Structure formats: C-alpha cells, structure tokens
Regions:
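Donor nucleotide-sugar binding/catalytic pocket of nucleotide-sugar-dependent glycosyltransferases
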Residues: 136-175
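Hydrophobic residues at beta-strand termini and immediately following loops
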Residues: 33, 50, 160-163
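A short helix/loop element that forms part of the nucleotide-sugar donor recognition site in Leloir-type
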Residues: 172-186
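N-terminal subdomain of nucleotide-sugar transferases
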Residues: 1-41, 45, 85, 137
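Extended catalytic core of nucleotide-activated donor transferases of GT-like folds
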Residues: 42-137, 143-147
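Hydrophobic anchor at the start of a short beta-strand
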Residues: 29-31, 113, 157-160
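Short, glycine/serine-rich, charged loops/turns that create anion-binding
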Residues: 5-6, 37, 97, 120, ...
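Cofactor-binding loop segments of dinucleotide-utilizing enzymes, especially the Rossmann-like FAD-
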Residues: 3, 35, 118, 143, ...
Length: 187
C-alpha cells in the first residue's frame, strides 16, 4: 500500500516500478491499495487497484474520510480492503507517521506485515521503533536506514535488508563502463 501508482510523487513512482516488476514475474496475486487514488481507477493496469478516496458525490464517505488526517493514508478503508482481498502479505513503504496505524487494525492478525519505513535520520522516535518491532519484517531504502533500524531495534526488529528505489530501465540506461573509462582517460 502506498500512493497511487500513477501519481507523480516519490511513493507513487516507487509503487509503479515495484508493482509492475512483481506482476511481470507472474508469481503473485497483487492488489494495490492506492492512497489518493479514486475508487474507479486501475482499469489501465493488470492488477487489482483499491482506491482510497471517497466515491464522488458520496457525502457520507467524504465526511468519514475528512474526519481524521490518517484517513488519507488508508486507515478508514484498510480493513474493508483486507477483508475483500485477504492478503497474505501487506507491504508498505512510507513514513512511519503515515502507516503506523496498521499495527492496531482489526485485520492485523491475518497478514504478514512487511514495512520499509523512510529512515533518514537518527535516532528514530521511540514509539516508531516500538511499532517497527511489531512488523513481521522490516526493510530500508538505504544502508544508513538499515543500520539505524538494526542499532535502535536491536534484536526486537526483524530487519531483512535494503530495497533501494529502482529506476525505470526504459528511461535510464547505464553507459558502458569501459567506454566511459576510455573517454575519460582512466585506465
């Protein structure tokens, strides 16, 4: 779960690249729970998409959505999505304050929670570390983040490694290393 795969945001781009690549393996049944995504989105991709925004012209849903700031991140619709899709694994990769509510959801006992929280400073807030300890697995965007998680979480967190953001291989192509070395006069 993250921001909608079609948004021009860091989390949206990460969602697009990750879900597209997972889908191409043909190993997984995937669903995207898309923050800032409309309920009728997802017709352009081969995986299931659950939009988090309230349905247009549904005042009751809008009132619920607007009643709590965490609802923009999915807290108001998460359990309903889990009951419908019945995931084995819920993967999220956003800031701790965006996803820490997952720990207290009614459906939490029924899925494995894998989280890659943004860790770009040290120390992390103690309440976040306590939440990290309740995840089934933790990843980090960077080696620095992984080191912080391991040091602060000690044996309480299950840090499994880094999953640095990928690039779009159709846009960013590496230059041949030997050609660059020759052009720069590096032996």
């Amino acid at each position: 779960m993250s921001e909608a795969h079609y948004l021009n945001s860091g989390f949206g781009t990460y969602a697009k690249e990750l879900i597209t690549r997972l889908h191409k393996t043909d190993k997984y049944e995937l669903a995207e729970f898309a923050s800032y995504g409309k309920t009728d989105t997802g017709k352009d991709v081969p995986w299931l998409v659950y939009g988090n925004l309230p349905a247009e012209n549904n005042q009751e849903e809008s009132n619920v959505y607007n009643s709590n700031g965490a609802h923009q991140f999915g807290s108001w619709r998460f359990d309903k999505v889990c009951l419908d899709f019945q995931p084995d694994i819920v993967l999220c990769y956003r800031d701790p304050w965006m996803d820490n509510w997952i720990e207290n959801t009614a459906t939490r006992p029924y899925f494995h929670w894998v989280w890659m929280p943004t860790v770009d400073s040290s120390p992390q807030r103690q309440e976040w570390v306590e939440t990290f300890a309740n995840c089934d697995a933790l990843m980090a965007y960077s080696e620095f983040g992984g080191k912080v998680l391991e040091e602060q979480g000690k044996e309480r967190v299950n840090f499994v490694g880094c999953a640095s953001p990928g690039i779009d291989p159709d846009i960013y192509k590496p230059f041949p290393k030997q050609k660059l070395r020759t052009e720069m006069g590096i032996d």
